[in-house]
């Protein structure tokens, strides 16, 4: 469960390393975001000499959370970290590589470009 002020790792090579959630896109008063939700975040740490800079406001989609994800078949998936992928206004990833495993629920949410770049889909 991601809420405002939560720090997340970045799971792509866009140039950002750490994000802080400042808003959850969707309903106006949602408290928590889950896997597949789009958030507005600020970059807290970035790689030098990249297009993304520290304190820049961006959009990101959540790909991993420490909170369990329950599937309809009874399977429960839990990750070791909270991670997101930086996206543009159309929902395409800004990076060209994705690091780590991502859930297959992203394919159902029309993030097919992120799923195709991922090395492992659970």
From Swiss-Prot:
SMART domains: Ribosomal_L14. Belongs to the universal ribosomal protein uL14 family. It holds the Pfam family Ribosomal_L14. Keywords: Chloroplast, Plastid, Ribonucleoprotein, Ribosomal protein, RNA-binding, rRNA-binding. Binds to 23S rRNA. PANTHER family: 50S/60S RIBOSOMAL PROTEIN L14/L23, LARGE RIBOSOMAL SUBUNIT PROTEIN UL14M. Its main location: plastid. This is Large ribosomal subunit protein uL14c. It is found in: Plastid, Chloroplast. One of its GO terms (biological process) is translation. Part of the 50S ribosomal subunit. GO terms for molecular function: large ribosomal subunit rRNA binding; structural constituent of ribosome. GO terms for cellular component: chloroplast; cytosolic large ribosomal subunit. It comes from Carica papaya.
């Amino acid at each position: 469960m991601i809420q405002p002020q939560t720090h997340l790792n970045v799971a792509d090579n866009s140039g950002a390393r750490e994000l802080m959630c400042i808003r959850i896109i969707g309903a106006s008063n949602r408290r928590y975001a889950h896997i597949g939700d789009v958030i507005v975040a600020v970059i807290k740490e970035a790689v030098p000499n990249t297009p993304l800079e520290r304190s820049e406001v961006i959009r990101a989609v959540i790909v991993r959370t420490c909170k369990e994800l329950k599937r309809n078949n009874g399977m429960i998936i839990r990750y070791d970290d909270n991670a997101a992928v930086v996206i543009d206004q159309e929902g395409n990833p800004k990076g060209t590589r994705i690091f780590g495993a991502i859930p297959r629920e992203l394919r159902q949410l029309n993030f097919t470009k992120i799923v195709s770049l991922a090395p492992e889909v659970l």
